[in-house]
Amino acid sequence: MTVIRKTHPLIKMINHSFXDLPAPSNISSWWNFGSLLGLCLIIQILTGLFLAMHYTSDTTTAFSSVAHICRDVNYGWLIRYMHANGASMFFICLFLHVGRGIYYGSYNMTETWNMGVILLFAVMATAFMGYVLPWGQMSFWGATVITNLLSAIPYIGTTLVEWIWGGFSVDKATLTRFFAFHFILPFIITALVLVHLLFLHETGSNNPTGLNSDTDKIPFHPYYTIKDFLGILILLMVFMILTLFFPDILGDPDNYTPANPLNTPPHIKPEWYFLFAYAILRSIPNKLGGVLALILSILILALMPILHTSKQRALTFRPITQTMYWILVADLLILTWIGGQPVEYPFIIIGQTASIAYFTIIMILMPIAGMIENNILDLE
């Protein structure tokens, strides 16, 4: 009798994706982040669903409804903090996942990579709108500042901003539509994830050597299911330590003050995972230029396959580009730090230097390093 997992139409699909999937025999723990991101998405959807049962998207009651969740709902405080810190864990995994992709040249699987870039934009949009919902000071002013950037678009800018706001300022209409979008987007993200996986399984996974591994495959289950499970345990442990012991460490104290359109906080800044992009935005004195740099700071990832000059796929055997890569990582950490600092000397000049370095390393230095390595190794 044939095994049901190989005959049943639905189970067969799942089996080919998770159980009998041929996987490279040498993929390291850097390949765990895909499954961890899946777990983060599930956690966010579930906690978000339970929060939505008690949340009201009205400017007069939004803040107090979040307070009510934390005070009066059974384990409401836990659900709320799991959702808030779950977003941070999501972005940590995302950045590591993207970093892995850049290091090992996974961007050469163009369809999978571009789908990933679209996913990154979708997750960032979702997180931004979610941050507005508690209707604290930083929620309100963050929404005002970021949506207002669209007014830099020539000719249609002002109309576009007022259309998104649903009025002449961030108000009830804005909050209601942000809640609607924040609710629907994770389900769209889930659909995009399936497409991401579909494209991935067309080519098969990359591996740390960057070489073709078709001759050396092992079944995904049990080898990588058990390996993913270890990653999941570590993630959940870090996540619960963060949620139960330091729930507010990544948040902004200003968001515990109800939104007040008449009182601007001294330093408006987004959540930590947007700070690098915010620093790039602020480093350009021109409004439209800043907006373009902000978008390009993420969109530049889509150019990675075009900027690849090396005859080798991964950075495993490329010390010069490796050096550039780790300088880029350090540069992103500097940008993240600068994004949270006030706009004054010396932070302005540090931010501008780090922003120039960011684009220079990706667009100029890494491609040149690839060519130099080709010459050194006579790979022309």
Swiss-Prot record:
The keyword Transmembrane applies. It holds the Pfam family Cytochrom_B_C. Keywords: Electron transport, Heme, Iron, Membrane, Metal-binding, Mitochondrion, Mitochondrion inner membrane, Respiratory chain, Transmembrane, Transmembrane helix, Transport, Ubiquinone. It comes from the Eukaryota. Its main location: mitochondrion. Heme b b566 binds at H97, H196. The keyword Transport applies. PROSITE patterns: CYTB_CTER, CYTB_NTER. Heme b b562 binds at H83, H182. Its cofactor is heme b. It is found in: Mitochondrion inner membrane. The chain crosses the membrane at residues 33-53, 77-98, 113-133, 178-198, 226-246, 288-308, 320-340, 347-367. Belongs to the cytochrome b family. The cytochrome bc1 complex contains 11 subunits: 3 respiratory subunits (MT-CYB, CYC1 and UQCRFS1), 2 core proteins (UQCRC1 and UQCRC2) and 6 low-molecular weight proteins (UQCRH/QCR6, UQCRB/QCR7, UQCRQ/QCR8, UQCR10/QCR9, UQCR11/QCR10 and a cleavage product of UQCRFS1). This cytochrome bc1 complex then forms a dimer. Component of the ubiquinol-cytochrome c reductase complex (complex III or cytochrome b-c1 complex) that is part of the mitochondrial respiratory chain. The b-c1 complex mediates electron transfer from ubiquinol to cytochrome c. Contributes to the generation of a proton gradient across the mitochondrial membrane that is then used for ATP synthesis. This is Cytochrome b. The lineage of its organism: Eukaryota, Metazoa, Chordata, Craniata, Vertebrata.
